[in-house]
């Protein structure tokens, strides 16, 4: 999958970072050492890493991903990355 979205809460800029959902590439999630979690009350799962977004962005760059866009939505920061 060539696109990846990662996000974090502004008050949590030191982590954790959300790096995927239940349909994400399992190989990539393993490379990021992400844990799959389901928050009580949600009917979906997300993959998290316990590190700041900067560290995760650096890992993704080493894997060939590049940031396409970044935005803030309320208290959430979101990055979209693409791999050629």
From Swiss-Prot:
InterPro entries documented for this protein: GFRP_sf, GTP_CycHdrlase_I_reg
Disulfide bridge map:
none
What domain of life?
Eukaryota
GO cellular component terms given for this protein: cytoplasm; cytosol; nuclear membrane; nucleus
A GO term for molecular function: GTP cyclohydrolase binding
**Alphabetized UniProt keyword annotations:** Cytoplasm, Membrane, Nucleus
Q: Which GO terms describe its biological process?
A: negative regulation of biosynthetic process
Q: Where can this protein be found?
A: Nucleus; Nucleus membrane; Cytoplasm, Cytosol
Its assembly, as annotated, is: Homopentamer. Forms a complex with GCH1 where a GCH1 homodecamer is sandwiched by two GFRP homopentamers.
PANTHER family recorded: GTP CYCLOHYDROLASE 1 FEEDBACK REGULATORY PROTEIN (PTHR16852:SF2)
> Any idea what job this protein has?
Mediates tetrahydrobiopterin inhibition of GTP cyclohydrolase 1.
Family to which the UniProt record says this protein belongs: Belongs to the GFRP family.
Name the record gives this protein: GTP cyclohydrolase 1 feedback regulatory protein
The protein's organism comes out as Xenopus laevis
Q: What is the lineage of its organism?
A: Eukaryota, Metazoa, Chordata, Craniata, Vertebrata
């Amino acid at each position: 999958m060539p696109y990846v979205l990662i996000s974090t809460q502004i008050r949590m800029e030191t982590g954790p970072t959300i790096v995927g959902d239940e349909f994400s590439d399992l190989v990539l999630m393993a490379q990021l050492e992400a844990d799959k979690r389901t928050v009580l009350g949600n009917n979906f799962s997300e993959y998290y890493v316990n590190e700041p977004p900067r560290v995760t962005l650096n890992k993704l760059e080493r894997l060939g991903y590049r940031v396409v866009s970044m935005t803030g939505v309320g208290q959430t920061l979101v990055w979209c990355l693409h791999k050629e």
